[in-house]
């Protein structure tokens, strides 16, 4: 096996707690499928026969119940409930299972990327790391319950690449930078022209050499792949031979002192050094690198920047809504055998359901009810003359006659009574909105009614 695939499904969704307080993030519905289904489906489509899923006991129960139809074997590993593990910690937790290079994905990645483009980059350059990034995009649609709420300032990443746009030369978050951007002279000697991007977003898909995982195992101070390991690997490129030799001498001293923190070069063996023969066919792709440069610089980092297609990380409430808006374009491509409207759904006025809407199994839609740009879950009841526009209704939601719902999320088992008018709201699980009530820009949860 060339790669072992690992899906990280541990994070609690700290930036969308209004949803994840009642539904674990990996199980949040997107297009009537659990969020974690998308990275698992991506792996299955490209031929993986087994994947390691690192998650919690709550998610494990759902995976065992709902994913038994997958051809791919799921090796589910639960972390202790009390553990506060980062992504690097999680890799260390399954270290004994990892025997080859590793492909790591986040459970919140939804993409139609041609995965081989990232993997081929990793292979062709014998890279230590190959990762996926996309151009950042802002949704113009309102976020339910967020109007007037101060938006968190997103910290940009400064990403430097070579003339091919593939070699990753510099990566740092602006929060970690001073007023000046300092580039090592050893990088500029080999790459005098560096192209910087500030509008790229990390998709959290990484190919990692096995020796990188070995390095992580011995360097327990690194807790995050994204914010600690990757910047470290990028910085370690183009280390001079003398500095490497000096490091080796230093490591001998460290071993004598039984200290555990070791440099990445301690874990790069001769077998990992690039040999020219297996890569003759793709050597033309290495235009920015010479054989001499590659052989000396054993740590090599590459990035595939996705310019077209769908690539979204569902890490905020706004991105969650946007994913549900976009998924009607993706599902017919990756699941052509499935209809957007389930065959068991009962719809009286079918012509009033938009072509870009999804309706789940056993849902009933009454006469003259309009559903546009929306996702409706399973076992919902939508009575007559209801209007649903640009919304997500989860499972077992009841909407009584004459109600109007716009740009909102209605969670499981909620009831919207007759004639209610709801706009830009998040209605929590099991909540009831009384008849003819008007709600605008609010979050309604357990013992909660927040006017934003």
Curated annotation (Swiss-Prot):
It comes from the Eukaryota. One of its GO terms (molecular function) is guanyl-nucleotide exchange factor activity. One of its GO terms (cellular component) is eukaryotic translation initiation factor 2B complex. Disulfide bonds: none annotated. Gene3D superfamilies: Hexapeptide repeat proteins, Spore Coat Polysaccharide Biosynthesis Protein SpsA, Chain A. The keyword Protein biosynthesis applies. Coiled coil: none annotated. Keywords: Acetylation, Cytoplasm, Initiation factor, Phosphoprotein, Protein biosynthesis. It is found in: Cytoplasm, Cytosol. The modification Phosphoserine is found at residue 261. Pfam families: LbH_EIF2B, NTP_transferase. Activated by the chemical integrated stress response (ISR) inhibitor ISRIB which stimulates guanine nucleotide exchange factor activity for both phosphorylated and unphosphorylated eIF2. The modification N-acetylmethionine is found at residue 1. One of its GO terms (biological process) is oligodendrocyte development. Its main location: cytoplasm. Acts as a component of the translation initiation factor 2B (eIF2B) complex, which catalyzes the exchange of GDP for GTP on the eukaryotic initiation factor 2 (eIF2) complex gamma subunit. Its guanine nucleotide exchange factor activity is repressed when bound to eIF2 complex phosphorylated on the alpha subunit, thereby limiting the amount of methionyl-initiator methionine tRNA available to the ribosome and consequently global translation is repressed. Belongs to the eIF-2B gamma/epsilon subunits family. Component of the translation initiation factor 2B (eIF2B) complex which is a heterodecamer of two sets of five different subunits: alpha, beta, gamma, delta and epsilon. Subunits alpha, beta and delta comprise a regulatory subcomplex and subunits epsilon and gamma comprise a catalytic subcomplex. Within the complex, the hexameric regulatory complex resides at the center, with the two heterodimeric catalytic subcomplexes bound on opposite sides. This is Translation initiation factor eIF2B subunit gamma. The lineage of its organism: Eukaryota, Metazoa, Chordata, Craniata, Vertebrata.
